């Protein structure tokens, strides 16, 4: 029913009850455990545990923890994990708890046809039992709250963040709501506190090779290596609850039953070809069509699309410029070699704001990209010439550098796509790239924010550390691609980079690149939710 969350915060009610977003933190789990551990009294006469009723008159439904019959009258009981409020005459029920029990009383009256004059709340944190007198004032407030809930349920727009910032500190949905990030925009010199998680909490599993088989034993995922004779050579065991996603490279064997189980556990599954291309995936798409309605409405407006595209292209070109500047700092000869390329990128940056169409932005971006990739070989002077590129080549890549970079971009595509779907947006409806291939436009849009930091810098750093050998590549006349050992190496480099932390210059807290991808998707959603101006503001130092 959500009455309690509505009185706590209207935005919380909307996220949970309308958009269907539920995040279970320690407090939520503790509340569930409390209700599971409550044992009924041996003498259960005149008592019903867990009474559920749907009212056609009020158009709400509710589940009462317990109803007890005393002197011929039914009394609704509610259990709370926390502590009672300290009043002038002793323990009192919190306002939201009073309203919740009153709504239960209204449901019980409709179900029994009898007047309900009182309810009780057990606060287990303070061990207090508080009596609630169901008077006309409480009934009136409960009915007004129900009407407000109905009104919010028909809206496609989220309510604003709570004015009382203390409410947000203990809210399980703060990482979705991002109230602190909103206050950074709306309040001058506001110092946000971190409510968004810093790092990923689970393991991303990558499985390579046709000789690999994915199975399940109890609540453990097994990755078995099978020889040509059918014998098991070795196996890897990972607890299901520790897996963030399963990524299958090549023709690894996985049964439909295993896929069904992973989906039921809300674990995404992704497939890559033996050549390293992203094929597709099964992502858990959360409920809440309101998010996609807001997305579609916003991105059909040319002014919004162009404004977002300018932010995106500016962020990408500036990242390319800053990386070249940083990599050539203190190296006069190398800086001189790249100066003309730096000038081209600087010139493009000056023209972004005056661009009046996506095609102009594409021209600026393309010119900057050619200059950027022309300058990258200067950063690899002491490396094996075998690994030094001659510009950017793709579909197919012509050299080991471009083959590795294309594979890293495929891994990035997967990460961005998974984050977009997890947030509840539609990856096929973007604002900059046009749908000209199987690649989804919004994924391509958001990838631009991370190509330099997650892929380009990672690859160049690994080449300068001499991490690659000839056996990591398979070379033909017309194409170069990574061998299995090369794809494993690139994957390890990418996943390690995702865990690196970086301080966001606007929200002023550090988080991993893995979390940064999710944060940017959520900040993008704020652009058309009345809370704009943080999306695509992060820059390399």
Curated annotation (Swiss-Prot):
Record-linked CDD domains: Cas1_I-II-III
Enzyme's top EC category: hydrolase
Annotated region described as CRISPR-associated exonuclease Cas4, given as residue ranges: 1-179
Keyword annotations: 4Fe-4S, Antiviral defense, DNA-binding, Endonuclease, Exonuclease, Hydrolase, Iron, Iron-sulfur, Magnesium, Manganese, Metal-binding, Nuclease
Binding-site residues, Mn(2+) 2: 365, 433, 448
Classification via InterPro entries: Cas1, CRISPR-assoc_Cas1, CRISPR-assoc_Cas1_C, CRISPR-assoc_Cas1_MYXAN, CRISPR-assoc_Cas1_N, CRISPR-assoc_prot_Cas4, Dna2/Cas4_DUF83, PDDEXK-like_dom_sf
UniProt keyword Manganese, yes or no: yes
Protein biosynthesis is among the record's keywords: no
Example of a GO MF term: endonuclease activity
Cofactor field: [4Fe-4S] cluster; Mg(2+); Mn(2+)
Subunit (UniProt): Homodimer, forms a heterotetramer with a Cas2 homodimer.
UniProt similarity note: In the N-terminal section; belongs to the CRISPR-associated exonuclease Cas4 family.
Function, in words: CRISPR (clustered regularly interspaced short palindromic repeat), is an adaptive immune system that provides protection against mobile genetic elements (viruses, transposable elements and conjugative plasmids). CRISPR clusters contain spacers, sequences complementary to antecedent mobile elements, and target invading nucleic acids. CRISPR clusters are transcribed and processed into CRISPR RNA (crRNA). The Cas4 region acts as a ssDNA exonuclease, while the Cas1 region acts as a dsDNA endonuclease. Involved in the integration of spacer DNA into the CRISPR cassette.
NCBIfam families named in the record: cas1 (TIGR00287), cas1_MYXAN (TIGR03983), cas4 (TIGR00372)
Name of the protein: CRISPR-associated exonuclease Cas4/endonuclease Cas1 fusion
Organism, scientific name: Leptospira interrogans serogroup Icterohaemorrhagiae serovar Lai (strain 56601)
